């Protein structure tokens, strides 16, 4: 039928069916009491950040968060406080007038991401480290405290990443970051992280992570760090889960030699019921050259350890966790109840709600 003269053509309204991004809010509090058998001076526990204090009630980690989740955009902003936060941001660089831990430690994460293709995301900001299985958030970990291996790899990084879902079973990431657990830069160089995850079967997951970057201040000769990590997780059935991690790092030094460290940890967890679980861990960490752990002793930090724990979850959003943990080192590096010399043995018990 002919359109009447002067009549405007009809336009069909096309409705956008893309769901709007959802915004959600959350909060978390992890309180604890820890007793270190070495009874360190000034209530400060050495060499681990969780728990960081001895013989006092305190907050390990508390945060509030806002999340954005959509088909094409995503993000998270979280503000935090706690003794683990103070311990982990103590090494934050303060170069210039707007850097340092005063601001950096308040921000747990602040990042935003966009989906650039059906299988590729690009994210940028401050975000949790892609190295390792163990989270900053104790609730998400099989053991209450992080292993030595995890404590001496980054909790967080600052930069940008590309995530590619290569297949339903394989995911790969590439990160460009400021450095090894820092928010502000300490030199003009950028560092790189790669991670590949493979869900081999419904019960077996494997991952590999690699890091490379200069970790020295701009005023000093470069020290390039190369780090490799292998991870495995097994859901064995009947309430059993197992985690295994091995890492090795090499750092160059100005005289053309290198320094090496390595670590290993194995964790097993058994769910006795829907509300009760037990967990055990064995671990070893060797940093003779004191790249990550400065002891000032001849053999550096060469330590084996273990822990046992009990988790009770009376309500959906409540966990009561208790853990007994011990260490044995080649050198006397642990507090010894106020004695003038330190001990090769260390340990503590911690309970958390």
Spans of model-derived segments:
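Outer-membrane beta-barrel "beta-signal"
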Residues: 312-314, 318, 341-353
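N-terminal periplasmic/intermembrane-space "pro-region" immediately following the signal or transit peptide
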Residues: 1-47
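Residue-level signature of outer-membrane beta-barrel architecture
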Residues: 66-70, 114-116, 164, 198-200, ...
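Surface-exposed beta-loop-beta
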Residues: 182-261
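Surface-exposed coil loops of outer-membrane beta-barrel proteins
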Residues: 36-58, 85-109, 116-199, 207-215, ...
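Transmembrane beta-barrel strands of outer-membrane/channel proteins
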Residues: 27-35, 77-81, 124-126, 174-178, ...
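Repeated loop/turn-to-beta-strand initiation elements of outer-membrane beta-barrel proteins
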Residues: 72-75, 119-122, 169-174, 202-208, ...
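Outer membrane beta-barrel transmembrane domains
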Residues: 210-217, 250, 255-258, 269-271, ...
């Amino acid at each position: 039928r002919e359109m009447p003269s002067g009549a405007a053509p009809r336009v069909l309204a096309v409705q956008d069916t893309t769901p709007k991004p959802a915004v959600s809010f959350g909060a978390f509090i992890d309180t604890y009491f820890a007793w270190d058998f070495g009874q360190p001076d000034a209530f400060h526990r050495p060499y681990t950040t969780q728990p960081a204090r001895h013989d006092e009630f305190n907050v390990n980690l508390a945060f509030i968060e806002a999340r954005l989740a959509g088909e094409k955009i995503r993000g998270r902003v979280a503000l935090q406080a706690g003794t683990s936060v103070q311990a982990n941001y103590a090494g934050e660089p303060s170069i210039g007038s707007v850097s340092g831990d005063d601001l950096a430690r308040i921000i747990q994460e602040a990042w935003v991401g966009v989906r650039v293709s059906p299988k590729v995301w690009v994210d940028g900001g401050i975000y949790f480290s892609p190295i390792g299985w163990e989270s900053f958030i104790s609730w998400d970990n099989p053991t209450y405290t992080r292993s030595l291996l995890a404590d001496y790899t980054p909790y967080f990084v600052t930069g940008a990443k590309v995530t590619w879902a290569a297949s339903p079973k394989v995911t790969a990431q590439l990160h460009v970051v400021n450095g090894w657990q820092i928010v502000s830069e300490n030199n003009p160089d950028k560092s790189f992280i790669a991670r590949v995850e493979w869900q081999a079967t419904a019960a077996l997951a494997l991952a590999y992570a690699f890091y490379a970057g200069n970790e020295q201040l701009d005023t000093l000769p470069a020290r390039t760090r190369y780090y490799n990590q292998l991870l495995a997780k097994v859901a064995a059935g009947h309430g059993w889960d197992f985690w295994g991690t091995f890492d090795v790092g090499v750092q160059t030094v100005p005289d053309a030699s290198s320094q090496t460290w390595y670590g290993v940890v194995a964790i097993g967890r058994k769910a006795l019921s829907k509300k009760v679980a037990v967990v055990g861990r064995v671990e070893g960490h060797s940093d003779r050259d004191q790249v990550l752990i400065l002891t000032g002793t001849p053999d550096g930090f060469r330590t084996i350890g273990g822990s046992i724990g009990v988790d009770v979850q009376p309500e959906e959003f409540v966990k009561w966790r208790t853990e007994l943990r011990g260490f044995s080192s080649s050198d006397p590096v642990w507090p010894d109840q106020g004695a003038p010399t330190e001990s090769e043995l260390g340990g503590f018990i911690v309970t958390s709600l």
